[in-house]
Design a protein with these regions (language model features):
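Active-site-adjacent structural elements in enzyme catalytic cores
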Residues: 1-165
Length: 168
């Protein structure tokens, strides 16, 4: 959620902007961590300030190991990666801008426009060209060489038997 900045949000959190982005984690373990933090500090608005676990232009990690592979060389002994298991949905998070009269989606993810309208009871605001993290063309560009093959015939024994039992 992108919200109007309060006086509690320091410049190093907001980059000096008049808004702040708040992540609402889907992980029950992370929600428990945040709830415990609020209890320990006796402050219902306690939060953890943290960057994304991927470099600019990279795909968001879906496991703790992916995060370590992506940013491990930048971690210090004071840094912590909470391994709560793999992400349930392997796509970028939805980003909703709530700084105007009506919410608007900056980046689609698991949460749909209909979900936002249902949760807020409001119709979404207009769309505009917005540059949000995770929408660059490079995010879903393969890093490996890709060979496009129009047609190939493989002998039966070359096709893994598990393909017929694959779940999509």
């Amino acid at each position: 959620l992108v919200l109007s900045r309060s006086s509690r949000a320091a410049d190093f959190i907001t980059g000096g902007q008049d808004s702040v982005a708040i992540r609402v984690p889907g992980s029950p373990i992370m929600r428990d961590v945040l709830q415990e933090l609020c209890s320990l500090r006796d402050d219902p608005f306690s939060a953890i300030a943290a960057p994304s676990a991927n470099r600019f232009g990279g795909v968001s990690p879906t496991t703790a190991q992916h995060a370590i592979e992506e940013i491990g060389d930048r971690l210090t002994n004071d840094d912590v990666i909470l391994d709560a298991g793999p992400c349930a949905i392997g796509i970028e998070s939805t980003i909703v801008d709530c700084t105007a009269d009506r919410p608007r989606i900056l980046r689609l993810g698991k949460v749909t426009a209909e979900d936002v309208e249902h949760a807020t009871g409001m119709q979404l605001g207009g769309h505009s060209q917005v540059r949000a993290p995770g929408i660059l063309a490079a995010h879903y560009s393969p890093r490996a060489s890709v060979l496009l093959v129009e047609k190939v015939e493989l002998p039966e024994q070359a096709i893994p038997s598990e393909i017929g039992r694959a779940h999509v």
